[in-house]
């Protein structure tokens, strides 16, 4: 919820310098809650707000970042040199057409569940649970989607359309993990690290959202190519 400082200052007297009344009046801090300490500071009140889920968000975002780096830099598993090898049985995840479809649609389902965060953020009728916990939920499903990505691809980027789909998905997770780390630090309130994170986190979040838009198109053509080519 984007609310200018001028709007908040104009409402201070009306809301009797009460952070809760100011939040109710202007809707500031009612989405993610990370700016609650700033609202209390503006009202001259003692900062009592403890950011919800910040520690969990930081931990899971770091795990997600590590998972993304593994996806990018880890070599794909070697191929089996014998049908009797255990690797040959594992390879069926990436060779068998039916298994590939199962893992692919499972990955898509996990990804879609993770998008529930957008409903919580953008629609007033969807207010179940605190946004901070939804953000942690979103991060956890990002990690699960990377695990599913390995099961589906073996971390092989492929070529042409498959490469760009994989690249976009991995980059989306990379930006999401970075935005999650910055959001967790931002929740610390008014420390220098929090102010630094608050300055750059919106750009990471915006880039994360922009990078999402090509994904449905790439995914659609990927699915069509499986069945028609």
Predicted regions and their residues:
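Local cysteine-cluster metal-coordination motifs and their immediate loop/turn environment
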Residues: 1-9, 24-44
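C-terminal lid/capping helical subdomain adjacent to the catalytic/cofactor pocket in oxidative enzymes
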Residues: 5, 46, 62-64
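Generic alpha-helical secondary structure signal
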Residues: 6, 20, 37, 191-198
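Regular secondary-structure segments
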Residues: 9-13, 151
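Short, flexible active-site loop motifs that bind/organize anionic cofactors or intermediates
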Residues: 12, 25, 202
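Short, charged, surface-exposed loops that flank catalytic or proteolytic processing sites
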Residues: 14-19
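Flexible metal-binding regulatory segments at protein termini and peripheral loops
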Residues: 20-27, 39-60
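Membrane-embedded alpha-helical bundles that constitute the cytochrome b-like, heme-associated redox core
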Residues: 51-229
């Amino acid at each position: 919820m984007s609310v200018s400082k001028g709007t908040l200052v104009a409402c201070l007297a009306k809301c009797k310098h009460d952070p809760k009344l100011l939040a109710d009046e202007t809707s500031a801090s009612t989405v993610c809650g990370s700016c609650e300490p700033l609202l209390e500071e503006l009202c001259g009140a003692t900062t009592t707000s403890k950011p919800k889920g910040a520690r969990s968000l930081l931990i899971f975002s770091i795990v997600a970042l590590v998972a993304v780096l593994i996806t990018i830099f880890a070599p794909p598993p070697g191929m089996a040199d014998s049908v009797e090898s255990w690797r040959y049985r594992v390879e069926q995840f990436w060779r068998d057409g039916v298994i590939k479809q199962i893992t692919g649609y499972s990955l898509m389902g996990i990804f879609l569940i993770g998008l529930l965060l957008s409903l919580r953020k953008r629609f007033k009728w969807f207010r179940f649970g605190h946004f901070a916990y939804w953000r942690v939920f979103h991060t956890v499903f990002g990690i699960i989607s990377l695990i599913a990505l390995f099961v589906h691809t073996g971390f092989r980027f492929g070529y042409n359309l498959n490469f760009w789909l994989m690249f976009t998905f991995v980059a989306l997770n990379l930006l999401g993990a970075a935005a999650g780390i910055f959001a967790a630090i931002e929740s610390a309130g008014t420390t220098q690290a929090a102010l630094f994170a608050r300055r750059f986190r919106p750009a990471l979040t915006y880039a994360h959202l922009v990078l999402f838009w090509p994904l449905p198109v790439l995914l659609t053509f990927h699915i069509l190519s499986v069945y028609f080519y």
